[in-house]
Amino acid sequence: MSRKQSQKDSSGFIFDLQSNTVLAQGGTFENMKEKINAVRAIVPNKSNNEIILVLQHFDNCVDKTVQAFMEGSASEVLKEWIVTGKKKNKKKKSKPKPASEASGSAPDSSKSAPIQEEQPASSEKGSINGYHVNGAINDAESVDSLSEGLETLSIDARELEDPEFAAAETLDRTGSVLENGVSDFEPKSLTAHSISNVQQSRNAAKSLSRTTPGAQVSNLGMENVPLSSTNKKLGSNIEKSVKDLQRCTVSLARYRVVVKEEMDASIKKMKQAFAELQSCLMDREVALLAEMDKVKAEAMEILLSRQKKAELLKKMTDVAVRMSEEQLVELRADIKHFVSERKYDEDLGRVARFTCDVETLKQSIDSFGQVSHPKNSYSTRSRCSLVAPVSLSGPSDGSAASSSPDASVPSLPGANKRNCAPREASAAMTNSSDRPCQAHREVFPGNRRGGQGYRAQSQKTADPSNPGRHDSVGRYRNSSWYSSGPRYQGVPPQAPGNAGERSRPYSAGTNGTGAISEPSPPKPSFKKGLPQRKPRASQAEAANS
């Protein structure tokens, strides 16, 4: 394959001739690898290709790249790269073909398309790997080739996951090719029959999912894949959800770092608080010890003074022989006073001790400090697995159930024409018992309002968009007036093929697409039976005579 060479510049930028854009030059292998590793250290859930594309968009600036991944704007950058690749891919595919080869090479082109897509994908992988090995952008098509490879991989994965979608797409392609030489009705009928077959296979898968509830999730996963009309809308909704999920995961990593920082700060604060408490306790202990030393010194001083006074009194008792009576009385009174203060000596020995309320302090220490636990306000979403199967399987079952009586009712007039008289009489009795008011209205043919009501009702039933009113038509035609002989003497017998054609649209309605693919032809058949009003009047005159 020929590659377009890009103009290289020594200023660190590349001018792309194809897209007319200025791209940043990659640099050496070591610099690019260091930048990729720096971005990956902060954003670990991104691939090397995505990091390279975002680095290329921000001129190999690591800070802007990390900021783009953290804020979620990197997905917009990647989307821009993929859009350029899609435009180039469309240019490659649009090649003029002669009209004679278009009808003959339709299946060959459908087969060779994935082969042509796989060849550039393999060559593009080589160019990407060459970018990593050589360390610089060798080609201006490397980014576009990456987007094309991603697109082909996504298309192949979608075709593997949704074979029904692939079948419908191939049928659409063949229909578009056949439009040149064949009439427009055949591809439409082909697509209609293919869609009916697809819906039958879906109904079979739904019945299997009802019988086996264990495989219900997998069946729902296959049935939830829509056709190509709604696939783009669903993909855009999924893209928004993926962006939100990506932002949430990036913020979770940031919150994890915040939690670690908060834990470290709290532990540091706790250690600081207990260190202050320990220093306060030690200071208090030192103060109490100093206080005890003072108490001890005071008590010893008091006791020493008491000891000295006791020694003085003893000396005075030794010289009491030489004292006068008055001195003896004073000495006796001093000894008595000294002895009477002995209880204070005992109190002094008891008071000189340490007392404290340890239990209260322990309780206050136990309640000291609080740690706030994280509130788990997260809740699990209630699954809608009971609603999804009903919404998926309800319309098809309801349409089959509602179309089955409608398919059987319009064939009643043709069948009653061919039935024998006893069967018609029994049908008339049952219908007259079901609808007494209508039978009473038919007895009096002179009532013009009744005839007008019947005419309006019959015209309503001729409308194929109102299939629910065919039941009343069948009951009118099974009545006694319509089962009589003169009513249908002037009407030619209807061929069985016409009756089959009348019942075909309604029987095909069970598949869900027959009413759309084929026009409904019951209008002329009902108009043939409506204008015959004279036999009723002639029969009434014959009855009166």
Curated annotation (Swiss-Prot):
Record GO cellular component, one term: cytosol
Keyword Phosphoprotein listed: yes
Tissue specificity remark: Detected in testis, in spermatocytes and round spermatids (at protein level). Highly expressed in testis, and detected at lower levels in brain, heart, thymus, skeletal muscle, ovary, stomach and lung.
Short name of any one Pfam family annotated for the protein: SPATS2-like
Domain of life: Eukaryota
Modified residues (Phosphoserine): 142, 145, 147, 520
Location of the region described as Disordered in the Swiss-Prot/TrEMBL record: 87-133, 202-232, 390-545
Comp. bias intervals (Basic residues): 87-96
Biased composition (Polar residues): 108-126, 455-464
Compartments in which it is found: Cytoplasm
UniProt keywords, alphabetically: Cytoplasm, Phosphoprotein
Low complexity: compositionally biased ranges: 97-107, 391-413
Family statement: Belongs to the SPATS2 family.
Designated name of the protein: Spermatogenesis-associated serine-rich protein 2
Organism: Mus musculus
